[in-house]
Amino acid sequence: MAAEREAGRLLCTSSSRRCCPPPPLLLLLPLLLLLGRPASGAAATKSGSPPQSAGASVRTFTPFYFLVEPVDTLSVRGSSVILNCSAYSEPSPNIEWKKDGTFLNLESDDRRQLLPDGSLFISNVVHSKHNKPDEGFYQCVATVDNLGTIVSRTAKLTVAGLPRFTSQPEPSSVYVGNSAILNCEVNADLVPFVRWEQNRQPLLLDDRIVKLPSGTLVISNATEGDGGLYRCIVESGGPPKFSDEAELKVLQDPEEIVDLVFLMRPSSMMKVTGQSAVLPCVVSGLPAPVVRWMKNEEVLDTESSGRLVLLAGGCLEISDVTEDDAGTYFCIADNGNKTVEAQAELTVQVPPGFLKQPANIYAHESMDIVFECEVTGKPTPTVKWVKNGDVVIPSDYFKIVKEHNLQVLGLVKSDEGFYQCIAENDVGNAQAGAQLIILEHDVAIPTLPPTSLTSATTDHLAPATTGPLPSAPRDVVASLVSTRFIKLTWRTPASDPHGDNLTYSVFYTKEGVARERVENTSQPGEMQVTIQNLMPATVYIFKVMAQNKHGSGESSAPLRVETQPEVQLPGPAPNIRAYATSPTSITVTWETPLSGNGEIQNYKLYYMEKGTDKEQDIDVSSHSYTINGLKKYTEYSFRVVAYNKHGPGVSTQDVAVRTLSDVPSAAPQNLSLEVRNSKSIVIHWQPPSSTTQNGQITGYKIRYRKASRKSDVTETLVTGTQLSQLIEGLDRGTEYNFRVAALTVNGTGPATDWLSAETFESDLDETRVPEVPSSLHVRPLVTSIVVSWTPPENQNIVVRGYAIGYGIGSPHAQTIKVDYKQRYYTIENLDPSSHYVITLKAFNNVGEGIPLYESAVTRPHTDTSEVDLFVINAPYTPVPDPTPMMPPVGVQASILSHDTIRITWADNSLPKHQKITDSRYYTVRWKTNIPANTKYKNANATTLSYLVTGLKPNTLYEFSVMVTKGRRSSTWSMTAHGATFELVPTSPPKDVTVVSKEGKPRTIIVNWQPPSEANGKITGYIIYYSTDVNAEIHDWVIEPVVGNRLTHQIQELTLDTPYYFKIQARNSKGMGPMSEAVQFRTPKADSSDKMPNDQALGSAGKGSRLPDLGSDYKPPMSGSNSPHGSPTSPLDSNMLLVIIVSVGVITIVVVVVIAVFCTRRTTSHQKKKRAACKSVNGSHKYKGNCKDVKPPDLWIHHERLELKPIDKSPDPNPVMTDTPIPRNSQDITPVDNSMDSNIHQRRNSYRGHESEDSMSTLAGRRGMRPKMMMPFDSQPPQPVISAHPIHSLDNPHHHFHSSSLASPARSHLYHPSSPWPIGTSMSLSDRANSTESVRNTPSTDTMPASSSQTCCTDHQDPEGATSSSYLASSQEEDSGQSLPTAHVRPSHPLKSFAVPAIPPPGPPLYDPALPSTPLLSQQALNHHIHSVKTASIGTLGRSRPPMPVVVPSAPEVQETTRMLEDSESSYEPDELTKEMAHLEGLMKDLNAITTA
């Protein structure tokens, strides 16, 4: 069918000449149809059949390229133009032309015609002001039918306009032997058509007379024959255009010096590689100057270099410009009396070129390929891709990767053709192409897969051999579905149950899209694949195919999976604009996003200075904002993000804008003066720093004057690129002051300080080095040596300064240069008692002179007589200690950034204006107190402020200042403190560990430590986790955690799955780096797990879900479907069912018989026992007569009456309370899954980020203690039961009845609807949370019936109803209560009460090996247990939720409910009176116990 569709596509109409095949090809169509049928065998290969055409031939790549491409052309109106183009292919291609992107209809065009070689011929070019049909961009298009199309580079045809003179020649004069210029500037297109005439005769050009590219005429070494009338003529196809005539007069040599003057300065220009550049430089003057050129401080050789030629007048011509020719060129003219110089910048641009061209590619359908294209050029070229002549628009399947490469995903047959990479910049464009051939699936790729094939798509390219093919993979499921990735798992095919040597290919496509993609497993036997880079909320169709050495097998049934939707976030804000409003402010405007996905709450405006990586943000509620306080003339980038209730949306594109320029805010730098001779001084300087220029420097203003106060100031302006100036015409032996200021278009900035220099008395000789200084004297002190000298005796040689060298034993260790006027210098910071060698040399521009040597030994520390150079004291005269100076005051620390603090202070010893006029200096010291042993750091300053840098972020420092003047120093000032600003964390959280939670394989616990370089208070953490470590970070799942926590639980993970975890810390400044990925594999499912979130398969009941048993789990199957071929016998299954039902029926019958027997026996002795034992009917079960009955233990019943005090206790015998112990996890039935799931959801919504077992900050840092169950065994003669409820921390053995909890709004207990016994245990934790009790409440149908102890009840209600003890607590108890309470749960409707009690003495016994263990005294262990009571132990003064206790024996639910109803209706008035009497007696006993 594919061949038939291909043949049908060839049958096109004759009107479409681009797609019609030649007649011989039409004759082959029947043959193509026959040959095309086996092509369906490729499709059959996917369905499990062996290949049908393995030996099919492979098509070869077709040579198809341009021999000649059009180039940019300049033409004039009315002329003819040929745009060359020629392409090679077999068969010959069809050539067409495009103009400005539209095909030209050459058949009906009279002026344009296609030449046989493919070139375009345009006759009689038309061009006018309003009609320019021929000017534009032309492109040649070559097409080979049934093969493809390629396009040439784009060529620009420019038609010159009407000639217009912007400047014309003017009358001038020139001395014989000098130079002259005559201007003639026209529009740039017509410069090649300019010629000159002298006296109406064509002017012949030679080495002495040249025409510059601008049209200007330069005449050098003028002669008398050069005089006359000159005019320039423009001939551009129409009538010639003449300029004005100008007369050039040639004057005789005046025999006097004429100052050098620039007739034409060099100007900066831009050229393209391969072109010629002419840098003009014409200087006139007498004597005639000699012009030389320099580049980057190197003299250019214009004599022997073939590319560098010096033209007439001194102009420099550079032929065949290369990128290395770019730079700054200096033109220097010198005539022996004067030197002038000028400079210009040459910028070289490079057309696009290819470092790596696309390569031809073979591929199969559904594969992914990449065409590589690496380009170069200046400016950096942009790249676009063209397929068969049409521009490729990036989409989901055509993507631009690595800036220039084209990636095609999920190839289809129609993707075949020619692909071209087109690179373009301001100075040109270029193209390079490659061919893509898509082979049938049964045709192997003939060569090794090139690097442009993705690694996941080349595994099935080897030719298949004969043999059985695998069947379809089984049980293909999506085990993990996210917004942008899906994880698929499957089982081996039935034909190969082991499948160790099978590889798998996953074919997938977006629903409704025919383009299919493929992803292969990474190794044989692997049965899972994660498909990345999917679209959110999109349906994808997946099919899995197994492959063995014989080929591809059957495909699995299509699996339809929809990715998760992303949160509905706002789209980008449209029409963002930014414009500068002042040198320090920029206004940004935007509009409401088109897809806001709800109400936009606010916007966040991000901006960043260009060249930095620190982005700042501002919250904005409107659609515009003006940012102030920006740097002047600085480029900033801006972007806007809209926020709705879901969070931040899509960011806009960055827009860049520069603040307006301003006058410079700082003076030029490094001002220096060089005295050339007796009448000139050269000034050198550097521009202000880039941050203070505030705009483009357009020039410099030089002001100078004589040192005398009343002298006039002279100003000189120079260009912005000039950094030195020669000032001439000065007086001999006179001191001058100079200062320089920078200029922008906005004005003049601040000037430098005045700098002085004195001209020489006479013009001295500087053709040789100075002579040796006439004398050298040294004066050693303790840590310094004073050096003095006299100048050389020969005063006729220029001395520009002195070089002092010194060192211990050698004078070459250090060198200091001083001014030529200086006669002494103090070398400081020397070592005491050390031998120093000192040398002194005079120097000038030629070099250094002969050195003069001297040596000296510094004085020891004990010698304090540091004598001034000009004051002679006795060598041993003691010098008194100097008076200390006053310390600086008002020390302040101003925080500037995270690592910089400015220290300022005042000096009371200075005048009021605080101006330093002497040699004092200040020492600043600083340190931080963390750690405590930190040493001080010091720095010296000569001003009243100092900038301390290199500090640590978010750190408190203390600063103090000391002043020193000569030998006098002050004490340290009072300290000032300053804390640096915070900075984003610069290190990730450390010690990241992941462990599985015990008993909950779906829950893991992540632990970590704070970053070592937090740089501020950590406000939170973000935990990232994913099953793919290579996934993009935005595809990872995130879990936010508050900053004071160092552990977090993650629940509901997939079993037996590797997860990768990363953690990122944040503070107020932003997010820090991520930690390295930590891998953790969740455990496999365990059938003994009874956790609500990880049940075994056999315990999944109604409302529960099956667990994830991992990708390797194979469920048992019956009969022939069993993977191992071992069928299960139906007889065994039926027998097992009969046994289970029989055991259940027998158990129920036994329980009912025992309950009836106990009820009847209790009824016959009820009244007698009550009168004899004075005991209320309760949950205690007694065996024996009255003498065995224990005294009252306050577990009593009453009816709507409050307790009254008791005077005494009727029986001093001790009472013990015991609690049964479940010995293993099977003794307690787990809670119902559906109930736990619901409660779990409510808990999560209530607790926020805390997990179900999270503890308080203090409790969470210490280990958990095992839970305990504690009975009471009273030892003293007057026993007291101390009972108080305490909350347990999520023990899996704790189960609470939903109806056994007291309502928070009531202070009385009420009857449960189903009074079942409840098992509990005690925890030593001090945390209480009522929500935990609710969370652990099971349903009534899952409560166990204990079989550990069974007895008959001796004390019953009048109707014989058996009751159980329950324990509850009121949440309205007085918060100031300081004693524990024993809460009583009656079996008939009487109110509960609380009595103060004292905890029992005696240490308990504790066995940590059991899940929950009773604490019994030795006496209680030896005593036969007659009764079981329930109680909870807790901490004094705290209110805890109730913890019910399991009673060993319990009736069925229905029977117990009936007994309770009978019990409630069996009370008569006389019995109530008797009961009240008992109650009053017990109150008296209670008073006696508590007061004893």
UniProtKB/Swiss-Prot annotation:
PROSITE patterns with a match to the protein in the record: FN3, IG_LIKE
Lipid bilayer topology: Single-pass type I membrane protein
Disulfide bonds: C85-C140, C184-C232, C281-C331, C373-C421
GO molecular function per UniProt: BMP receptor binding; cadherin binding; co-receptor binding; signaling receptor activity
Domain Ig-like C2-type: 63-158, 163-249, 254-347, 352-437
GO biological process terms held by the UniProt record: cell adhesion; intracellular iron ion homeostasis; multicellular organismal-level iron ion homeostasis; myoblast fusion; negative regulation of axon regeneration; negative regulation of protein secretion; positive regulation of BMP signaling pathway; protein secretion
Glycan-bearing residues: N84, N221, N337, N501, N520, N670, N746, N940
Assembly, per entry: Interacts with BMP2, BMP4, BMP6, and BMP7. Interacts with RGMA and RGMB. Interacts with MYO10.
Free-text note regarding domains: The Fibronectin repeats 5 and 6 mediate interaction with RGM family molecules.
Protein name, as recorded: Neogenin
